[in-house]
């Protein structure tokens, strides 16, 4: 009831609505350009399915990067691209998703480097913001994004940026990890321009159970063998 009363405060404002304590991008809806009361209310309903407490956050512009910190050092950085399909001018979004999901790197249950793309309520809401639906036929060469959040767990693609991000942001990620008292964690950071150390940035989340294997098998880029860093931390090697 309290959430519904507050809806009018957020109409047409760039916001993120998400459960307080979930992982893997579950229950999250993002409205980078703002939206109407109906979509906000539906986003609340989805989020409350997963937690008794729901957060409303300001949407931060930029691209999201996952910094994997192990024992006070950054051992991998991924840019995660939201679930998407590339049009051919013939197939619908539904058909393109089915085709992309045939990639052997994609599976279900977080046992593969990438997850299969889902076509559910969250994806339908995000496509609606683009005046599209699952039966839309993208133009040849047109990329259509199905979600705003870029989690691998919701069908996103992964690109390794470990060697490309300025040391300044690696140091910030380590400081965030230390502040949280974590020896292993994933720091999610938004950067407007990853190549500029003076760019705007924001830490949007710290994860205490980060997926390590996604850095070992990126969709694009260098494979990072980070399991050995965990073994070193545990003094097993």
Predicted regions and their residues:
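Membrane-targeting and insertion segments and their boundary/processing signals
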Residues: 14, 143-147, 200-204
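Active-site nucleotide/adenylate-binding loops and adjacent lid/helix of ATP-dependent enzymes
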Residues: 1-118, 166-171
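Glycine-centered flexibility motif
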Residues: 25-27, 43, 62, 141, ...
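C-terminal active-site "lid" helix and adjoining low-complexity regulatory extension at the edge
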Residues: 152-168, 178-182, 191-237
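A long amphipathic alpha-helix within ATP-dependent nucleotide-binding catalytic cores
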Residues: 50, 100-195
């Amino acid at each position: 009831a309290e959430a519904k009363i507050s809806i009018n405060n957020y109409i047409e404002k760039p916001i993120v609505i998400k459960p307080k304590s979930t992982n893997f991008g579950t229950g999250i809806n993002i409205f980078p350009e703002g939206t109407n009361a109906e979509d906000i209310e539906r986003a609340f309903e989805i989020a409350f399915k997963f937690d008794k407490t729901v957060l409303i956050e300001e949407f931060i512009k930029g691209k999201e990067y996952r910094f994997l910190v192990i024992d006070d050092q950054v051992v991998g950085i991924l840019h995660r691209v939201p679930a998407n399909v590339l049009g051919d001018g013939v197939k619908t979004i539904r058909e393109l998703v089915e085709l992309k999901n045939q990639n052997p790197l994609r599976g279900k249950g977080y046992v593969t480097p990438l997850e299969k793309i889902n076509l559910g309520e969250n994806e339908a809401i995000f496509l609606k913001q683009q005046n599209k639906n699952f039966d839309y036929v993208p133009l040849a060469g047109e990329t259509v994004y199905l979600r705003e959040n870029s989690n691998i767990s919701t069908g996103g693609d992964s690109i390794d940026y470990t060697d490309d991000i300025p040391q300044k942001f690696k140091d910030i990620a380590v400081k965030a990890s230390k502040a949280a008292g974590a020896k292993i964690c994933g720091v999610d950071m938004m950067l407007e321009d990853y190549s500029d150390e003076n760019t705007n940035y924001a830490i949007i989340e710290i994860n205490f159970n980060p997926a390590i294997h996604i850095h070992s098998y990126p969709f694009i880029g260098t494979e990072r063998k980070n399991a050995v860093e965990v073994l070193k931390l545990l003094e097993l090697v």
